[in-house]
Amino acid sequence: MSRKRTSPNRNVQIADQIQRDLSELIMREVKDPRIGIVTIQSVELTPDYAHAKVYFTALTGDPAKTQEALNHASGHLHNLLFKRLHIHTVPTLHFHYDQTIEKAVEMSRLIKEANSTRAKDDDEADAAAKDD
């Protein structure tokens, strides 16, 4: 007897639905003061839907405390998702702070710094060439 395989497209659809539902549920149902303004950036599901990595950013508050609070509320959120989603297995939620924005800002800063250093070196080289 062969097992029915889920399509990658269905996995993406369910992950997107979980992302939308979690965004709403966190805002309306979770009352933990450690959780400020949170945006769910993405959800990655395992193929069997047993686990979901939920990536978030926090506009306010400490990201580590927010992550701790979200992971503490994950059981409650799991139960609320179970009532909304019409799938056999609702994944166990694992929240992770998404550092993409901070990394992008740091990369931009490094590029800007490198460009200004290069421009300064070019100006010094031009000045030295004029002196010769």
Curated annotation (Swiss-Prot):
GO cellular component: cytosol
UniProt-annotated location(s): Cytoplasm
GO biological process: maturation of SSU-rRNA
Protein name (database record): Ribosome-binding factor A
Metal-binding is among the record's keywords: no
Family: Belongs to the RbfA family.
Pfam families: RBFA
Alphabetic keyword roster: Cytoplasm, Ribosome biogenesis
Subunit structure: Monomer. Binds 30S ribosomal subunits, but not 50S ribosomal subunits or 70S ribosomes.
Purpose of the protein: One of several proteins that assist in the late maturation steps of the functional core of the 30S ribosomal subunit. Associates with free 30S ribosomal subunits (but not with 30S subunits that are part of 70S ribosomes or polysomes). Required for efficient processing of 16S rRNA. May interact with the 5'-terminal helix region of 16S rRNA.
An MF annotation (GO) of this entry: ribosomal small subunit binding
InterPro entries registered for this protein in UniProt: KH_dom-like_a/b, RbfA, RbfA_dom_sf
